[in-house]
Amino acid sequence: RALDEGIFDTYKPDLLSKVSAQFILDDTNHVTSIDYGYVNLNYDKSFLAAAGMAPPTTLEELTGPDWKGKLVVENAATSSPGLAFLISTVAYFGEDDDYDYLDFWADLKANDVLVKDGWSDAYYSDFTKYGGDRPLVVSYSTSPAAEFLFSETPVTEPPTGNILIDRATFLQ
């Protein structure tokens, strides 16, 4: 709508030719993509190891007793990772199937999913890696690498991991 209303000025970055074609959203140079990343589930490796648990391999598992009260997600209305995860659940479960994304979210709610307004609060307050009580969090695929690179004390591997489930990882 904003493009149609003509509210943007044109600007062509000098290095636009280095941007992948999939991210060129406007060939009139009114809008330029500046950032992207994959959103998926992350897990606290130490917590799961101590509990003798393996990360879930399907979204359906998140509604089972093993994962009750163990997932924190971001609100889709206030957080882009939360919206990305919601969209991925629509892609995964569909909209009009016998069991669709609305059924999944109802089951997540019944399984004590915690919904926070933003990523920082979910990750740094409720994720077990930072003292919370939820070993699963919706985050970025780059979060484990960031945990490794920016660790206050040197580590030999990331303390968190990605849960890469087909159709449950979203490029934003």
Regions found by a protein language model. Name each.
Residues 9, 24-26, 32-35, 64-66, ...:
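Extracellular/periplasmic catalytic domains that process cell-envelope and extracellular macromolecules
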Residues 53-58, 101:
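Short, charged, surface-exposed loops that flank catalytic or proteolytic processing sites
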Residues 60-80, 88-93:
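Short loop->beta-strand "edge-of-pocket" segments that line small-molecule binding or catalytic clefts
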Residues 81-165:
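Ligand-binding pocket segment of bilobal, Venus flytrap-like solute-binding proteins
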